[in-house]
Amino acid sequence: MGRIKDIFMANVIECRGVYKNYMSGKMEVPVLRNVNFLMAEGEYTAIMGPSGSGKSTLMNIIGCLDVPTEGKVLIAGQDIAGLSDNEMSDLRLYKIGFVFQTFQLLSRQSALSNVELPLSYAHVPRKKRREMAMEALKKVGLEDRVNFMPSQLSGGQKQRVAIARAIVNNPKILLADEPTGALDSASGKQVMEIFRQLNREGVSILMITHDREIASHADRIVEIRDGVLREDNGAEKGDGELREKRAADDRDYDEAGGGDAV
């Protein structure tokens, strides 16, 4: 894994003075402006913003798919400045799980094979790979769909396969970009329940959404507009009934001593 280290950190994400500019013809267009953002280990945060607000650009930088024009970014305690392409790939592979709106499943591979993919890149032996993939699918309630092809799965089931793939390598951070955007409300609710369970188990989750109802499932909401972040306490004063139910669920989970994901 080269310089990618597994060290204890208080924050899994640190962005300090981050700017991102793109060229449009001869003009430099600012997309992110002096972004300062910290996310603690074990936190569940939603970043909200309209189209063109810069939220996807920020997600790409945090996910080590892009680099800032200016500023410092640390992911899982690792400063990404100066990392080689291979080291950036290792950081994504071992420390970050990705969930996308469009699932990004391989159409000619089974659910199990799709989930095994990151483990193949990590050179995990075949038998161990299969065991880990089966366990991840069990966590999302799809142990009875392991041999199904994506075309045989509903939208919600496809997203659950994508979540299993994202967590199979036990990443420090789960990044979710509009994870319910292509789902009906029932499937979206199921995905949010899985995220809550994963967070209870210690997974740090950063979710991007334009939907305040979806954002309210997180413990913290940060809004972005015109490339500028501003903290928002909407999650605290938004859907009170939802938050009360979640607190009760968390208490029940603690009293039961934990358990499998939904």
Predicted regions and their residues:
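Feature targets compositionally biased, intrinsically disordered low-complexity regions
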Residues: M1, R16, S24, E70, ...
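Short, Lys/Arg-enriched N-terminal segments with co-localized hydrophobic residues
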Residues: M1-F8
